[in-house]
Each structure stands twice: as C-alpha cells, then as structure tokens.
A protein has these predicted regions:
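Bacterial N-terminal signal peptides that target proteins for export
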Residues: 2-13
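Alpha-helical and His/Cys-centered functional microenvironments
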Residues: 8, 19, 101
Length: 546
C-alpha cells in the first residue's frame, strides 16, 4: 500500500513532467524571425536529410539529360523552342487548386500563410474556430483532408463535357503539401490525409478521356510562404515540423509583375536543388504535357536551375511523346520564345505574335474552395475565351473542389454551360488562328494581369475574329434585338474580300447578307441558336490568305 507521501511525490513528478512539456512546447513555438537565414535553412535541411540522396540523384539525372537532346540549359538554346500545334489547337483547359487549404475553406488558398498574419481575417477566424496557432497549426488540417468523395473519373468526365482539351491540377501549392506520391517528402497526399496519389489518379483518368494532362508546381514559393509565422508563437517555429514547413524565410520581395532581380529573400543552393529535383520527379513520374509555374521561378537564385529544368523537361518530353512539352511562366521569369507566357486573371489589348495563355478562376474570390463563394457567369467565361482566342491565346479556367472531393454544383453548371456553347460553336474556337485584326466594336478590354473583371459589358457591335484554313469566323458577343448585324471589318472599301457565304453555327436558317461600303450587313433569325454569343462562318470568293 502506497503512503500519502509516495503519492504526493508521484503527483509532483507528473506535474513536473507536464510543466516541462508545456515549457518545451512554448519554447519550440516561440518566434524565430530574428534567427539568421542560414541557421533557419540548416534546420530545414537537417529535417529533410533522409531524402538527400534521392534529391541528389535527380539533380544529377537532370544535368546528364540536359546533354542528351536538342535543348541545352541556356537561353540561346531554349529560345529555339516552338509551341506544339496541339496546344495552339486546344484553346481551353481546366486548372485545379485542391489541397489541405480546402479544409478551412476561408479567405482563399493563401489561408496557410494568412492564418499566421497577426490581425488578418484569417488569423482571427483561425483562433476563433481552431485555437491559437501554436496549439493548432496548418499541419493539423491534414488529417481532416480526407477526400472521401473524390473520383478522378467523374472529374475527367465533367471536364470533357465542359469542352476542355487539357487539365492542369496543382501538384504542390505554396503550402508545401504534395498532392502526389513523392519520393522526396513524407508530407504528401499519398502518405497522409487522403492517402491517395491524387495526381496519378487524375493523370490516368484525364488521359482516358482523350485530354492532355499537365501539372502545376508552386514548390519554389514555399521557401518564403510561411515565413510570417516566425513572427508569432506558432508551430512553424518548431523544428520537428521543419520538413513540412520548409525554410519559411522572411519574404523580402519587390513589387509584383516586374523582374525579380531585386528580390533579396534568402534562397540556399539546397533549396534551389530541391526545387529542381521536385520538378524532375513530376516529369519522370507523370510525363506531363504541360508544366505550369507561378511567378517566383524568376527569382535570381533559382534562375540557373530554371534553364536546367527547361532543357531537361523539353528533352524528356520528346523521349516519351510525339511532341515537346509546354512550360507556362509569368511576368519576366523566362526569355521570350523559350516557353508560353501566362497572364494571371488578365487579357491583352491586341493580338500577340507569340502564343500566350490566361489563367483565371471561376471563383470571384479564390483559387481554392471557400464557403459562401461567388462565381463568374457562363457568359463571362465564354466571352473571355472568345477574346483570348482571337488574340492568339488559350484560357486555363480554374476550379476549387471541396476537401471531400466534390465540385460545387454552381461550378459544375458553369462548366456544363460553357461546354454546351462549345458543342455548337467549337469550330470557331478549336484549331483556329488569329485573323489580321482580333475584332471590332466599342467595348475596350481592360488589358494586363488582374484586370479580367474590369471589362464592361459587350454590345451587339462587338465582334471577334478567328480563322481556320480559308474560313473566317466572326463571333458576335451580343445578339442584336432588331435582328440586324453589321461587321465593319468586312466592308468592301477597306479591302474586305468578296464574301461568298455566311452560315450561322447551330442554325439551319439561310442568312441574307449584303456587303456594302460600310460593312457586311446581315439579317439574323428571330432566335439565337445559343446563349451568350453566336458564331458566323464566312467564306470568300478567293482564298482568305492569298
């Protein structure tokens, strides 16, 4: 029988152990922003050292393969790149932002960072809903990310019905959680959370539907993404989670949209090689037709490895397929001609001679799923697609599924409505090339990144033009209520070719038309064949391109 004294000693010991654990937790989560970057980086390197050999092997493979194909890791060689015809023909793709950030479903896909920004809406919401960031950090959402209703086959079927020709899921976002079966990390969807190779399943399902498959990597941004968490008591400061949270350096950024030469954020050679190895791993495992990168690949410390990756990927794509791959880049990260420029949430004011792409989200607020979201209309998406295609570009439209793997009904309906329009009018979009002018009409497009919602409503006088062989397509962006349309660019007095025939896609009506000095006058039927926009197939007495 134990004495009261023995019990008191035991209780005291338990109390001391508990206090020690609390003190350790407080110390481990204490702010570390004042530590020097090299020390912080060494902590990440040590935490992820179990994969050093695998990383080094992939980097070595990249450097060897850079000497085994037509491309070399320098800009002069990379600028001989030519965009594959399939990509120019495709016009419309689906982007997917899906990850652990879909669990809190608050703010936007930058929740993993903003939840640590003291005073932000995400910071306040996180404390109210889950507790303080040193007790419940971003990592603690991972077990809640179950994806129990995720069906890659159902997604792929929907994307095909939407009229998309390629699909690009985010393989790893800024948060550092890989959505694929990586051999370079324990923090992956294949090993935690859903315990499924999401990217592998999507690759198989998308290709089974006859669509092209790509991946998006935002691994490089993880270098700084969670650095703000070092300014408050948080789990990011705890070295036992460094393999997931990464270096988490302080972001010393220059203004967005300009060259990153003056971005002084600390980037170690180890991180640059980790980024290169992760990219090479995605190429080797999934043979993507497209690799999409966000803006930070232009950071000065990354650029030497960027040319290595580009040469490796282009050479590899020629080995495993019948065409060279496509790299999407932003701003000034890559040299002109070496890849495909991407404008985030933006459009151009005129035809660009080099092929380009816009990526935007069907959501008005976020790239990932959030509660109480609002969405773009089918008309908005279709009009944007038409305008971009007329200017020699593609549209990559993003969706954000819920954490359980379901796609909101509102999003599905937008995609299906776009697909229904393309089913009738696709000849005016797929496989087309720009005409001598992109279009006409009074409505001016708000050009540049992050302006895609600034364009005012189109009028019946607004048209966009595309060509295919000797056919011109004139796409009207609003149906005239009086049934009469005039295409000024086809006036005889401004060099318009003699028009032979005009057909309204989706209609059996025989159109009456008259080519006059002020334009091509058309009498349209009482009812438009489709909502949102209509397409006219125009042929000429002589070859269009003579």
């Amino acid at each position: 029988m134990l004495s009261h004294r023995s019990l008191s000693i035991r209780n005291l010991g338990a109390t001391l152990i508990a206090l020690s654990a609390i003190l350790h937790a407080q110390t481990a989560s204490a702010p570390t922003a004042s530590q020097d970057p090299e020390s912080i980086d060494r902590t990440w390197q040590k935490a992820s050292s179990k994969y050093d050999e695998a990383r080094a092997s992939l980097v070595k493979q990249v450097e060897a393969d850079d000497l085994q194909g037509p491309f070399r890791p320098d800009w002069e060689s990379l600028q001989r790149y030519e965009v594959p015809e399939w990509y120019k023909d495709a016009k419309f793709g689906i982007f997917i932002h899906w990850g652990v950030y879909s669990v809190p479903a608050f703010g936007n896909e930058w929740y993993p960072r903003n939840m640590y920004v003291e005073g932000s809406p995400e910071y306040k919401h996180h404390i109210a809903a889950y507790g303080h960031q040193d007790k419940f950090g971003y990592k603690d959402f991972i077990p809640m990310f179950e994806a129990e209703h995720f069906s890659a086959a159902a997604w792929a079927e929907l994307f095909k019905k939407a009229g998309a020709k390629y699909v690009v899921p985010v393989a790893e976002h800024h948060d550092g959680f890989a959505m694929y079966d990586s051999g370079l990390s324990d923090w992956t969807a294949a090993k935690m959370g859903p315990r499924r190779d999401v990217i592998g399943e999507l690759a198989k399902a998308v290709r089974a539907e006859g669509l092209r498959f790509g991946v998006s990597s935002h691994r490089v941004e993880h270098d700084f993404f969670l650095g703000v968490a070092r300014t408050i008591p948080s789990d990011v400061n705890d070295s036992q989670y460094a393999a997931f949270y990464g270096p988490a350096h302080t972001w010393l950024a220059n203004p967005s949209g300009v060259p990153l030469n003056d971005d002084f954020t600390y980037v170690s050679s180890a991180w640059a090689d980790d980024w290169l190895a992760r990219g090479a791993e995605l190429v080797e495992k999934y043979h993507p037709d497209i690799v999409y990168f966000d803006w930070w690949i232009g950071q000065a410390s990354i650029r030497p490895n960027l040319t290595k990756f580009a040469a490796f990927y282009y050479n590899s794509s020629l080995k495993y397929g019948d065409h060279v791959g496509v790299i999407n880049y932003k701003d000034y990260a890559m040299q002109a001609h070496s890849a495909v420029l991407d404008l985030e949430r933006g459009q151009l004011g005129d035809i660009r001679s080099l092929y380009w792409q816009t990526d935007t989200s069907v959501s008005n607020k976020s790239w990932g799923y959030i509660k109480d979201d609002t969405f773009k209309s089918p008309e908005f998406v279709i009009h944007q697609l038409i305008d971009i295609v007329s200017k020699n570009g593609n549209l990559l439209m993003n969706i954000g599924p819920r954490s359980d793997g379901t796609i909101p009904d509102e999003v599905q309906q937008v995609l299906l409505d776009v697909g229904a329009w393309l089913n009738v009018n696709g000849d005016a979009i797929y496989g087309t090339r720009p005409w001598r002018v992109f279009g006409e009409g009074p409505t001016k497009v708000a050009a540049g990144s992050f302006h895609d919602t600034d364009t005012t409503r189109y009028t019946p006088e607004d048209f966009r033009f595309t060509t295919k062989a000797d056919v011109l397509y004139a796409i009207g962006l609003d149906w005239p209520t009086n049934g009469e349309a005039v295409i000024r660019s086809l006036a005889q007095t401004v060099g318009g070719e003699p028009v032979k025939s005009v057909v309204l896609l989706g209609s059996d009506a025989k159109l009456q038309f008259d080519q006059r000095a002020d334009g091509l006058h058309l009498r349209l039927p009482a009812q438009a064949p489709t909502k949102y926009a209509y397409a006219l197939r125009v042929t000429f007495d002589r070859a269009l391109h003579e």
